[in-house]
Swiss-Prot record:
GO cellular component: cytoplasm
Provenance organism: Klebsiella pneumoniae (strain 342)
Gene Ontology molecular function: metal ion binding
Protein name as catalogued: Iron-sulfur cluster repair protein YtfE
Alphabetical UniProt keywords: Cytoplasm, Iron, Metal-binding, Stress response
Length: 220
């Protein structure tokens, strides 16, 4: 099957572990989920045929859950428990670790200067964003009013883009979240946590942008 003309967001939802593969190639399948595989590969100067071959292997495995067919209230409940609650745990811990690493290793050339600041900004933005979803948008969708939620959904998508931009800054100052040889245990643990947080946030945004919001607007 040719995957190159399909949107990244669709591929991430229909092929097991495709999201992890896209993350490996630094391809944005959440905020940039509407771009085709061919377009995304071209922008990164990647060989689309190689990625297609890897996707073909992954596609042989069964999909654990196809959220495209799930009831909208079930998707919302899953998002809150799997992603919102998790982000609320992850970010305060990462901020504490970043504060320590920046203080203890201030004289090291590879220290991620500004990481605490940008993690704090992400935490503040996501906290406000998730609260608005849980208090305003999600209840509207659960009440069958998704088709009238174009305004709130547009705002949420814009905030997703802003979160994506912060992730790019965080990846830049951490050298794509790669610990240097001199990194201590806390430093390494923090980078592991940041990678996990980025994976979770990209999956979270993808599920909303590519499944929940379009279906809600379409009254499905």
């Amino acid at each position: 099957m040719a995957f190159r003309d399909q949107p990244l967001g669709e591929l991430a939802l229909t092929i097991p572990r495709a999201s992890a593969l896209f993350r490996q190639y630094d391809m944005d399948y959440c905020c940039g989920g509407k771009q085709t595989l061919a377009r995304a590969a071209s922008r990164k100067a990647l060989d689309v045929a190689v990625i297609e071959a890897e996707l073909a292997k992954l596609a042989e495995q069964p999909l654990s859950r196809d959220w495209r067919a799930a009831p909208l209230p079930e998707i919302i409940d899953h998002i809150i428990v799997r992603y919102h609650d998790r982000h609320r745990e992850q970010l305060p811990e990462l901020i504490l670790q970043a504060t320590k690493v920046e203080r203890v290793h201030a004289d090291k050339p590879n220290v991620p200067k500004g990481l605490t600041k940008y993690l704090t900004m992400l935490h503040q933005e996501l906290s406000s964003h998730m609260m608005k979803e849980e208090q305003i948008l999600f209840p509207m969708i659960k009440q069958g009013m998704g088709a009238q939620a174009g305004g709130p959904i547009s705002v949420m998508e814009s905030e997703h883009d802003e979160a994506g931009e912060l992730l790019e800054v965080i990846k830049h100052i951490t050298h794509n979240v790669t610990p240097p040889p001199e990194a201590c245990t806390t430093w390494k643990a923090m980078y592991n946590g940041i990678n996990e947080m980025i994976d979770d946030l990209m999956e979270h945004i993808s599920l909303e942008n590519n499944v929940l919001f379009p279906r809600a607007l379409a009254g499905k």
